[in-house]
């Protein structure tokens, strides 16, 4: 289903090295970008490690063996595929203009093989989810530092009327310098100056991290930073306790246990 190692895109500009991950809406590859760097010694050709996301709607698509083109099983599926491909391209182009030290940079969005690709900065590091799986509950000072950094990233995108809508530990990378970087704007929404939604989005709910507004189709039609703030708080709870919070839609009948009851080492 994925592109083979060594496959080239954009007439040789990018080369796939291997698959990093795969989800319901796409495949993520590590690759290299062949580019030129100008300096005191002249122009030097170099290879820059990058990350490439391929839009691949797993439940609706298949790949042709010889051409590597992505095809859709049915006409109904093609309507959905095309709709969300256009949304992905639109949002990726917006994000290519958004540069912040705690957000992974988008280099380019392009179409090939009858689908869409996003070339992004490659971050050497691991996600907070992987870090937790490996180390267990994280120390409070470290959690506060990461949450503060992602909060700065969210403030930046919120000022541009963009909601991320999928904040969770697996979408926060910690790079080799220890800096938190927000990734995966695949279900994000952008709003106009009147704070009305200008793009549709794929319905994706990360249970325990999604705000109650995200369970209602009309809950995110108008801009509000609340869904992202809630999800960042839920992420903080998870990092400090090791527990995924009660789903927001169930909180009225299933109270959330206090973090200090689950982790005696954190501030009350």
Spans of features found by a protein language model:
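C-terminal lobe helix-coil module of Hanks-type protein kinase domains
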Residues: 208-268
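Conserved short submotifs of the Hanks-type protein kinase catalytic core
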Residues: 113-127, 131
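Activation-segment/catalytic-loop signature of the eukaryotic protein kinase fold
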Residues: 109
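AlphaC helix of the eukaryotic protein kinase fold
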Residues: 62-97
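Protein kinase catalytic-loop region centered on the HRD/HxD motif
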Residues: 150-162
């Amino acid at each position: 289903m994925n592109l083979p190692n060594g496959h080239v895109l954009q007439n040789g500009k990018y080369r796939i090295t291997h698959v990093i991950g795969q989800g319901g809406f796409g495949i993520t590859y590590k690759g290299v970008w062949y580019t030129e760097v100008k300096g005191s010694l002249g122009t030097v050709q170099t290879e820059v490690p990058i990350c490439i996301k391929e839009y691949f709607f797993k439940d609706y698509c298949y790949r042709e063996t010889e051409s590597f083109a992505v095809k859709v099983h049915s006409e109904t599926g093609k309507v959905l595929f095309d709709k969300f491909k256009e949304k992905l391209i639109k949002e990726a182009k917006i994000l290519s203009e958004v540069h912040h030290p705690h957000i992974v940079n988008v280099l380019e969005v392009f179409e090939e093989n009858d689908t869409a690709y996003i070339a992004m900065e490659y971050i050497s590091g691991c996600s907070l989810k992987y870090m937790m799986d490996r180390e267990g509950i994280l120390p409070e000072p470290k959690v506060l530092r990461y949450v503060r950094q992602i909060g700065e990233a969210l403030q930046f995108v919120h000022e541009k009327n963009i909601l991320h809508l999928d904040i969770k530990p697996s979408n926060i990378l910690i790079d080799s310098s220890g800096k938190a970087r927000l990734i995966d704007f695949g279900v994000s929404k952008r709003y106009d100056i009147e704070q009305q939604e200008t793009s549709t989005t794929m319905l994706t709910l990360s249970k325990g991290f999604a705000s109650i507004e995200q369970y209602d189709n009309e809950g995110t039609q108008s801009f509000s930073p609340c869904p992202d703030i809630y999800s960042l708080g839920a992420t903080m709870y998870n990092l400090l306790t090791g527990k995924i919070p009660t789903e927001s839609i169930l909180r009225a009948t299933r109270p959330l246990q206090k973090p200090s009851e689950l982790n005696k080492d954190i501030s009350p």
